């Protein structure tokens, strides 16, 4: 089983010398081999500044390995949110289950929310351990065509806190990309932490050469959530990440008895649809609140399969249909299949 003690060796570009540091890297360390090492704002006052500034620099030797590993992945999709608590990881799990409901598609789910890994619980794979082979780390498979990877599988105890600075998080993300034997995938869904942190910068940097299809941004209707989504959209544009679209999650509650709809989070400024129009990005739809989504996540079940008649399932499947069209993999119409 891979160890959490030292996710990635801190080597120079020759690959055989470790950069000896006087003190642990600061939280926003750009990396000791980065072009910004010793020069970035986070380096000011760091005891390692002189060491990093004088260390040999060069192209990251792992980038070609990542590019080679990602050759077998057709579509890479980031799931982002500006604020925590809007259902980003929940929606990542729904995307994983939804893409995998097409048995002709191979799907991977990568959890880079290093300090808050919740996907193992949501996917019903808590307690599983990562196995290694000559091909690399083996993903944990929750169905025949849906594999996943998370730091949650590497914890000795599920309640253990992960207290890592940026450089160590970045090292693990790099290993998820270059060491995991993803095989040939149609979709790799990447669940990220909220905000714009080291994890976001790392995954966009590491996947730059192999290409990212784009980002799906999750929000809730209220302005407090939209404030942070605006920053997330700005991050995408500055980083050169295409925005596939915006999803408004928990947009309303449909009573299962009277079918009336109540808006739990009032869209005081127009909600996600108005924001999408403001930024001229696609609005993928509104997903109503259904308490059974939480129940399915707690039990590690596929909500869309367990509750196919839910209005939330209809909305989720429509979002998936639009994402597939956006990346050039439109769903085949079931009626057409029957005619054939």
Curated annotation (Swiss-Prot):
InterPro entries linked to this entry: Mrp-like_CS (IPR000808), Mrp/NBP35_ATP-bd (IPR019591), NUBP1/Nbp35 (IPR028601), P-loop_NTPase (IPR027417), YlxH/NBP35 (IPR033756)
Amino acids binding [4Fe-4S] cluster 1: 29, 43, 46, 52
Cofactor note: Binds 4 [4Fe-4S] clusters per heterotetramer. Contains two stable clusters in the N-termini of NBP35 and two labile, bridging clusters between subunits of the NBP35-CFD1 heterotetramer.
Region (Disordered): 1-41
PROSITE patterns, per database record: MRP
Cofactor requirement: [4Fe-4S] cluster
Any one GO molecular function term: iron-sulfur cluster binding
Keywords recorded for this protein, A-Z: 4Fe-4S, ATP-binding, Cytoplasm, Iron, Iron-sulfur, Metal-binding, Nucleotide-binding, Nucleus
Binding residue positions for ATP: 82-89
Entry's localization field: Cytoplasm; Nucleus
Record's compositionally biased regions (Basic and acidic residues): 11-30
Gene Ontology BP annotations: iron-sulfur cluster assembly
Residues that coordinate or bind [4Fe-4S] cluster 2: 255, 258
SUPFAM superfamilies the record matches: P-loop containing nucleoside triphosphate hydrolases
Keyword S-adenosyl-L-methionine (UniProt): no
Gene Ontology cellular-component annotations: cytosol; nucleus
One Pfam short name: ParA
Family per similarity comment: Belongs to the Mrp/NBP35 ATP-binding proteins family. NUBP1/NBP35 subfamily.
Record function comment: Component of the cytosolic iron-sulfur (Fe/S) protein assembly (CIA) machinery. Required for maturation of extramitochondrial Fe-S proteins. The NBP35-CFD1 heterotetramer forms a Fe-S scaffold complex, mediating the de novo assembly of an Fe-S cluster and its transfer to target apoproteins. Required for biogenesis and export of both ribosomal subunits, which may reflect a role in assembly of the Fe/S clusters in RLI1, a protein which performs rRNA processing and ribosome export.
Subunit structure: Heterotetramer of 2 NBP35 and 2 CFD1 chains.
PANTHER family assigned: CYTOSOLIC FE-S CLUSTER ASSEMBLY FACTOR NUBP1, NUCLEOTIDE-BINDING PROTEIN NBP35 YEAST -RELATED
Protein name: Cytosolic Fe-S cluster assembly factor NBP35
Organism encoding this protein: Yarrowia lipolytica (strain CLIB 122 / E 150)
């Amino acid at each position: 089983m891979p160890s959490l003690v030292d996710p990635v060796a801190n080597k120079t570009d020759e690959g055989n010398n470790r950069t000896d540091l006087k003190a642990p890297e600061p939280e926003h360390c750009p990396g000791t081999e980065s072009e910004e090492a010793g020069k970035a704002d986070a380096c000011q006052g760091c005891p390692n500044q002189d060491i990093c500034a004088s260390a040999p620099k060069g192209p990251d030797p792992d980038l070609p390995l990542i590019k080679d590993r990602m050759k077998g992945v057709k579509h890479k999709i980031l799931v982002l949110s500006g604020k925590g608590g809007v259902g980003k990881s929940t929606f990542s799990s729904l995307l994983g289950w939804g893409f995998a409901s097409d048995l002709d598609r191979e799907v991977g789910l990568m959890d880079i929310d290093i300090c808050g890994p919740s996907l193992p619980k949501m996917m019903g794979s808590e307690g599983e351990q990562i196995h290694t082979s000559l091909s690399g780390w083996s993903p944990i498979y929750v169905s025949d065509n849906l594999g996943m990877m998370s730091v949650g599988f590497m914890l000795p105890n599920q309640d253990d806190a992960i207290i890592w600075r940026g450089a160590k998080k970045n090292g693990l993300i790099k290993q998820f990309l270059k060491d995991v034997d993803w095989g040939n995938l149609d979709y790799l869904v990447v669940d990220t932490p909220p905000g714009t942190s080291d994890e976001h910068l790392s995954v966009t940097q590491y996947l730059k050469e192999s290409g990212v299809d784009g980002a799906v941004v999750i929000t809730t209707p209220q302005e407090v959530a939209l404030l942070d989504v605006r920053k997330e959209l700005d991050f995408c544009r500055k980083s050169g990440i295409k925005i596939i679209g915006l999803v408004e999650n928990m947009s309303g509650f449909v009573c299962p008895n009277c079918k009336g709809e109540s808006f739990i989070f009032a869209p005081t400024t127009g909600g996600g649809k108005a924001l999408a129009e403001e930024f001229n990005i696609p609005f993928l739809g509104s997903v109503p609140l259904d308490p059974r989504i939480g129940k399915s996540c707690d039990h590690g079940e596929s909500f869309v399969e367990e509750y196919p008649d839910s209005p939330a399932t209809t909305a989720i499947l429509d979002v998936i249909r639009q994402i597939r069209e956006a990346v050039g993999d439109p769903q085949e119409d079931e009626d057409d299949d029957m005619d054939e």
